[in-house]
């Protein structure tokens, strides 16, 4: 059982989603926000599944592009995220996540392939195979030590309604082309209209909630960065807490207490970054040597 403590907002990494139909300005808006979040353009990476759309805005700055082509299996997205992390990126733009869901080799195709294998067709059991694969993709986004901006295509959503006994199809808004509920995983979710104006659909930061539509800029990213850094700095908190580590059990609890600082190494293990590992190792050796004396 965990110990009861006062609520305290930690410094965080943003998880921001941009949704719009084709031509809504998702890539451009994502790059501007990313620049506000990053210390420089070369600390931004775009995982590009949109046939080179990220390169269209190279005049903005010297950002990095990792092109991802079919098949769009979730694991390929995960590997791309880890590659960007290991390269020292501060912001990762995933443009877009739609292909992970509905693209060639994506989740919908994986599900259909599972159904096709069955003698007695059962879509429910096929989803039991797909859901864990998709969840690993979500976890890679949520657990990343980088700020992450996702773009997703949206389309007009319709539903059948009964109007005095007559069936009719009515437009009910826009639907994101990804698994239902993805936006609930995010810190902030913005819908872009045809004029590239953003409307907030979800905002845990309360920075934009209730505001009129606005055009995302570099300043938008700077505002978000300031919010992220206004909480308790977990890295500094961990380093300060090392002086209180006097038993092996104290060191064993660090990964649980500071789970947000963990990264995924090339072997797929969740570990602290190298600088923190060195600090922890040095303190552990200091404690061990003291006990031997």
Pin down the residues of each PLM region.
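Residue-level preference for the first positions of well-ordered beta-strands
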Residues: 15-17, 43, 91-93, 147-149
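Nucleotide-state-sensitive switch-loop elements of NTP-binding domains
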Residues: 37, 41-91, 117-120
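Interfaces that engage single-stranded nucleic acids at replication/repair/recombination sites
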Residues: 1-20, 24-26, 35, 51-54, ...
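Hydrophobic positions on the alpha1 helix immediately C-terminal to the Walker A/P-loop
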Residues: 29
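Phosphate-binding/switch region of NTP-binding enzymes
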Residues: 21, 131-221
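Conserved catalytic network of the ASCE P-loop NTPase/AAA+ motor domain
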Residues: 9-11, 35-40, 83-87, 140-144, ...
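Conserved P-loop NTPase nucleotide-binding/switch module
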Residues: 94-130
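Switch/connector loops and helix/strand junctions flanking conserved nucleotide-binding motifs
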Residues: 54-57, 100-108, 157-163, 197-201
């Amino acid at each position: 059982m965990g110990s009861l403590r006062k609520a305290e907002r930690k410094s965080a990494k943003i998880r921001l989603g941009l949704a719009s139909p084709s031509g809504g300005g998702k890539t451009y808006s994502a790059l501007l926000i990313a620049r506000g979040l990053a210390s420089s353009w070369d600390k931004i990476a775009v995982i590009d599944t949109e046939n080179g759309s990220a390169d269209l805005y190279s005049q903005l700055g010297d950002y990095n592009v990792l092109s991802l082509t079919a098949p769009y299996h979730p694991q390929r997205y995960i590997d791309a995220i880890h590659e960007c992390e290991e390269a020292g990126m501060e912001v990762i733009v995933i443009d877009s996540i739609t292909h992970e869901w509905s693209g060639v080799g994506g989740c919908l195709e994986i599900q259909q392939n599972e159904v096709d294998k069955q003698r007695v067709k059962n879509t429910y059991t096929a989803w039991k195979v797909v859901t864990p694969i998709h969840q690993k993709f979500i976890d890679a986004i949520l657990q990343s030590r980088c700020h992450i901006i996702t773009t997703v295509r949206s389309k007009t959503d319709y539903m059948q309604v009964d109007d005095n006994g007559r069936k009719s199809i009515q437009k009910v808004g826009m639907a994101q082309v990804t698994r239902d509920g993805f936006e609930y995983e995010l810190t902030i979710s913005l819908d872009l209209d045809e004029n590239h104006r953003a409307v907030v659909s979800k905002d845990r930061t309360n920075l934009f909630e209730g505001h009129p539509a606005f055009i995302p800029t570099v300043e938008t990213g700077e505002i978000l960065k300031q919010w992220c850094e206004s909480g308790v700095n977990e890295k500094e908190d961990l380093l300060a807490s090392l002086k209180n580590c006097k038993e092996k059990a104290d060191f064993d609890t660090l990964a649980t207490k500071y789970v947000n600082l963990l990264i995924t190494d090339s072997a797929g293990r969740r570990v602290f970054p190298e600088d923190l590992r060195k600090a922890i190792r040095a303190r552990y050796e200091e404690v061990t040597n003291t006990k031997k004396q």
